[in-house]
Amino acid sequence: MLDQAYSRRQFLGLAGGLASIVGLGLVGCGGAGAPSAADKGSAAAAESVSGEVTYDGASSFQALVEAAAEKFMDANPDVSVSGSGNGSGKGLTAVAAGTVTIGNSDVFAETKLEADQVKNLVDHEVAVVGMGPVVSKNVKVDDLSLEQLKGIFSGQITNWKEVGGDDATIVVLNRKAGSGTRATFEAAVFGDEAVDFKGDAELDKSGDVQTQMGSTDNAISYLDFSHFDDSKFNAIKVEGVEPKSANVTDDSFKIWATEHMYCAKDADEATKAFLDFMLSDDVQGKLVEEQGFIPVSAMKVVKDASGKVSAK
């Protein structure tokens, strides 16, 4: 599923008029905190809504947002939802500046913005996603330790033979600074250790990584699970643990993030309605998993802004 800017499809004039998704008393933004998915029921309700919702941010879950937006606009033809996935940092900066109504992020806003910016935003945790290393089809390595990943992504390990593979130079495809996927990966691999290694390329989006990994031999990168594509590259184990959702729910697989959608406390009604929909059963009950993500309700652990993991 390649990343692309999502443009509004106008469904005005649908015969019979579709039921609105907006509930009475929208509280997704503007209150002390966002409602949890468990608090949200069916999306069907009585009031209509109109307006324009715009977003930017993480490319890792852009496809989930796009799929939800399609359903939301089907039922709310007077609402336009559009946006793109230019990275968590850009999305958070944009929503804080008011140039978009929603900022999508793989990381907590506290890690990218100043405190006075964060206090004006409301966080909606819409999903959890695993992220893991991927290697080219010709690479004969199917498991790496965190220490080996640290060596590769710091430039200390440069040949596949050093980690059990063939004698070939490792091509490191990194993500650009500001990427939430990169921040999540580096936090899991390096902890608090500072790292400034660009690799052989720094790519903008998850879709760019998919494309480059599919056409480059001896390469390594990292992607969220929803962008894994075994026709182009191989997802590998970390510390002997398979990169799959079941191993993320209890933190057996260590590289994962919560997907956040931030809005301003004084967000407009259309934005509130769409974010309420993201937390509704219509999205959380089925769509999240269909798109390769994990419902927040399925997690046995939680991770805070500092990266500390604790049991629910």
Where are these regions (language model features)?
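N-terminal secretory signal peptides
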Residues: 1-6, 14-27
